[in-house]
């Protein structure tokens, strides 16, 4: 990922916005811009490869902003998965980056993205993504803002679509966007 990508889904009546950020320090400006748009971080770590150098950079920025953290150890189905070692790698990295006790006590899930499953226990295979979404809802605080205040939005990127026209992508700070507003 060079530029952040975003999507959203609705789970239990809550809209969850997901932003995939570049992981490399060379794209630090993009990472910092994106982290201003989110309330928490889902750190995805490969069960075989473990923490990558770019993991350190993005995680450090997220911890500095005191964002809520959920760790997902992915690809646990790989024959070369090192789940317990990767858990230790993540914890050592968090400690090395000066994580608070609350950040160190973050929930960890064990996932197989290919199969669309997540589990809270590495020894119990997941059957769906319900544990992941439930954990996101219980761990990451909803955005703060006043829906009655005038509309304010922190625009992080601008795009263009032939059908819709100019599109501003960002985080609503206050107010509500209404259809037909300019």
Language-model segments: which ranges?
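Structural and coupling elements of P-loop NTPases
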Residues: 1-182
